[in-house]
């Protein structure tokens, strides 16, 4: 398998919405797996159809403004109180939460190679490796950047995260996310977001899988404002897909893992918790194909700020200052005249964690491989390496299309603390800073 190559779009319908999904972002959806399972004109009937229980899942306070109010009504075989037992602490493995100060690593620009696939059997819960944490999970602010390495599907195991919503960014291998709300299938170049409190399990489709995982402790991801761009381009609402209802009526023992307060807890259940027969509301998991992102850019001169590539944003209480921005660098045309076209040299109040899904990143043609990661923390300088600088400074400025590439960035207002796993990993590149060593003094006061 060539992990550097851009994957083809698999399973997309030629017209209309992909079967098994509903189109739109933040819509008030309704879906039922059995006819008549959804009540009409009310949320909590005296007796729900099919002997179901009505239950509300709230992703925001009751009194949140209507535009930010998130909740769904679920009609399920058993209420969630039956999916809860005596919890005991479970081994967190390499999963960490903010604040995490377990390693006193000197400040530096950092980069990692792709981690190798595990040789032992590892499920999703066991396979999360935290790279950085930021903010504080207990104040619902900040994030964690993880890698996941999975070699075995979750069988009779389920999980939900009370600490934050999870964004899956596959890099190698397809995943099947079996959630309470329905089934989501994703592949490299797609993402999936699972809200807080939503139970799910992770299944492999075609062998071991590797990817990135963003844990958002703060406000839910939403679409960024377009401002003067107008009503179109960037990520369009219609390209987000939410699953239709499906359920399991399965009375076999299962384990339920819950991440709560930065710790992992487990309990045993006599049945599957994936038992929602119908639901309606706007608090639900979704997927998005990054290849449908419509980029905008400079069509005259200069290099615009990377914020024009924002797919989703988790806002903070300060307008224009994100808890997290999820930004991608997809295929696009470079046409600016008399311009240094790669990302410029930069020091930033925001902290940037980057990953590469496939292809080559234009500012780092060497050393930044698919499945790898980099960290440029707040106010630490970064920018193109010597090779990228020389090529961009001296090359012919004809229109060039960057093809077969997909990088992303998780940018947060908080400094990102490196975990012990990330600080001591064999994949950490000790010589990363050497990529700028070849940049020479070019100043000559006699030559304007």
Swiss-Prot record:
Q: Is Oxidoreductase included in the keywords of this UniProt record?
A: yes
Organism source for this protein?
A: Rhodopseudomonas palustris (strain BisB5)
Q: What class of enzyme is it?
A: oxidoreductase
Catalytic residues as annotated in Swiss-Prot or TrEMBL: 303
> Subunit structure, per the record?
Hexamer; dimer of trimers.
Lineage of the organism: Bacteria, Pseudomonadati, Pseudomonadota, Alphaproteobacteria, Hyphomicrobiales
The record's SUPFAM superfamilies line, in alphabetical order, gives: RmlC-like cupins
Protein name stated in the entry: Homogentisate 1,2-dioxygenase
Q: Does the keyword Electron transport apply?
A: no
Q: In which pathway does it act?
A: Amino-acid degradation; L-phenylalanine degradation; acetoacetate and fumarate from L-phenylalanine: step 4/6
Q: What is its EC number?
A: 1.13.11.5
The protein's required cofactor(s) are namely: Fe cation
Q: Which GO terms describe its cellular component?
A: cytoplasm
Which molecular function term from Gene Ontology is one that the record holds? iron ion binding
InterPro entries from the UniProt entry: HgmA_C, HgmA_N, Homogentis_dOase, Homogentis_dOase_bac, RmlC-like_jellyroll, RmlC_Cupin_sf
Q: Which residues bind Fe cation?
A: 346, 352, 382
Positions of homogentisate binding: 361, 382
**Gene of this entry:** hmgA
GO terms, biological process: L-phenylalanine catabolic process; tyrosine catabolic process
Q: What does this protein do?
A: Involved in the catabolism of homogentisate (2,5-dihydroxyphenylacetate or 2,5-OH-PhAc), a central intermediate in the degradation of phenylalanine and tyrosine. Catalyzes the oxidative ring cleavage of the aromatic ring of homogentisate to yield maleylacetoacetate.
Write out the entry's keywords from A to Z.
Answer: Dioxygenase, Iron, Metal-binding, Oxidoreductase, Phenylalanine catabolism, Tyrosine catabolism
């Amino acid at each position: 398998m060539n992990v550097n190559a851009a994957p083809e779009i698999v399973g997309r319908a030629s017209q209309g919405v992909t079967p098994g999904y509903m189109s739109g972002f933040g819509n008030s959806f309704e879906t039922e797996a059995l006819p008549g399972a959804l009540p009409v004109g009310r949320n909590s009937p005296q007796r729900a159809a099919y002997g179901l229980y009505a239950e509300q899942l709230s992703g925001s306070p009751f009194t949140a403004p209507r535009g930010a109010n998130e909740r769904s009504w679920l009609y399920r075989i058993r209420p969630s109180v039956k999916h809860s037992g005596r919890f005991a602490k479970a081994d967190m493995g390499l999963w960490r939460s903010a604040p995490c100060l377990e390693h006193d690593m000197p400040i530096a620009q950092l980069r990692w190679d792709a981690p190798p696939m595990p040789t032992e059997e590892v499920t999703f819960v066991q396979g999360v490796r935290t790279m950085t944490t930021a903010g504080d999970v207990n104040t619902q602010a900040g994030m964690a950047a993880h890698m996941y390495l999975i070699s075995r599907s979750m069988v009779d195991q389920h999980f939900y995260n009370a600490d934050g919503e999870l964004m899956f960014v596959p890099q190698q291998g397809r995943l099947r996310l079996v959630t309470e709300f329905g089934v989501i299938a994703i592949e490299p170049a797609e993402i999936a977001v699972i809200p807080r409190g939503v139970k799910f399990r992770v299944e492999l489709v075609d062998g071991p899988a590797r990817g990135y995982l963003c844990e958002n402790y703060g406000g839910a991801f939403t679409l960024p404002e377009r401002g003067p761009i107008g009503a179109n381009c960037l990520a369009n609402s219609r390209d987000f897909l939410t699953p239709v209802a499906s359920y399991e009526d399965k009375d076999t023992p299962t384990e339920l893992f819950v991440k709560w307060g930065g710790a992992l807890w487990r309990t045993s259940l006599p049945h599957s918790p994936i038992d929602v027969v119908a639901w309606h509301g706007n608090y639900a998991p979704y997927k998005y194909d990054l290849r449908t992102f419509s980029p905008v850019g400079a069509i005259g001169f200069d290099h615009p700020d990377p914020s024009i590539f924002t797919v989703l944003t988790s806002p903070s209480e300060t307008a224009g200052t994100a808890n997290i921005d999820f930004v991608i660098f997809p295929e696009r045309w470079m046409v600016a005249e008399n311009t240094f076209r790669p990302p410029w040299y930069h020091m930033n109040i925001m902290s940037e964690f980057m990953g590469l899904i496939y292809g080559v990143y234009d500012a780092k043609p060497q050393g930044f491989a698919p499945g790898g990661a980099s960290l440029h923390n707040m106010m630490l300088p970064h920018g193109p390496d010597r090779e990228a600088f020389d090529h961009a400074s001296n090359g012919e400025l004809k229109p060039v299309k960057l093809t077969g590439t997909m990088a992303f960035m998780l940018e947060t207002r908080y400094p990102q603390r490196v975990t012990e796993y990330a600080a001591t990993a064999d994949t950490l590149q000790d010589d990363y800073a050497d990529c700028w060593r070849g940049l020479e003094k070019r100043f000559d006061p006699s030559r304007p």
